[in-house]
């Protein structure tokens, strides 16, 4: 038996209301659509947000703000991922080369997740306080660049 073979037990669910099946059904004649008007007709439809020709709310309210693209180009790197970088210097180019971050990433921040067991020099990359302590405890250094 599979999930798509399950069905509710008989009588546990009410039957669906079938529109336009006689007056006794409660949805006969106009089938719950009322008399005349756009919504009673087949194809009676208007797009979402349409207000009958009145200037819609979405266009009446002014635009404001913007979406910063910096978040799309910022990567977080864990301490144990730094170990994948060859050499003693960890910078943006070295992280790209090692495949730790994608080529389109322009900003990197090292976060204190995992452990680091070798001395590395981190330069040109932002580092959290916890990550800085871990790097320095392993004998490495963090070089701030202007």
Swiss-Prot record:
The keyword Ribonucleoprotein applies. PROSITE patterns: RIBOSOMAL_L15. The keyword Ribonucleoprotein applies. Residues 1-54 are annotated as: Disordered. NCBIfam families: rplO_bact (TIGR01071). Part of the 50S ribosomal subunit. Belongs to the universal ribosomal protein uL15 family. Binds to the 23S rRNA. This is Large ribosomal subunit protein uL15.
């Amino acid at each position: 038996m599979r999930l798509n073979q399950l069905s509710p037990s008989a009588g546990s669910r009410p039957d669906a209301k079938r529109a336009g099946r006689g007056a006794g059904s409660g949805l006969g004649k106009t089938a719950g659509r009322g008399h005349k008007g756009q919504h009673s007709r087949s194809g009676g439809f208007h797009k979402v947000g349409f207000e009958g020709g009145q200037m819609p709310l979405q266009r009446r309210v002014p635009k404001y703000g913007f979406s910063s693209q910096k978040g799309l180009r910022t990567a977080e790197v864990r301490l144990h991922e730094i170990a994948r970088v060859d050499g003693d210097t960890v910078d943006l180019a070295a992280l790209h080369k090692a495949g730790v971050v994608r080529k389109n990433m322009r900003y990197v921040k090292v976060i204190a997740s995992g452990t680091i067991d070798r001395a590395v020099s981190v330069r040109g990359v932002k580092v959290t306080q916890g990550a800085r302590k871990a790097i320095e405890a392993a004998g490495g250094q963090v070089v701030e660049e202007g």
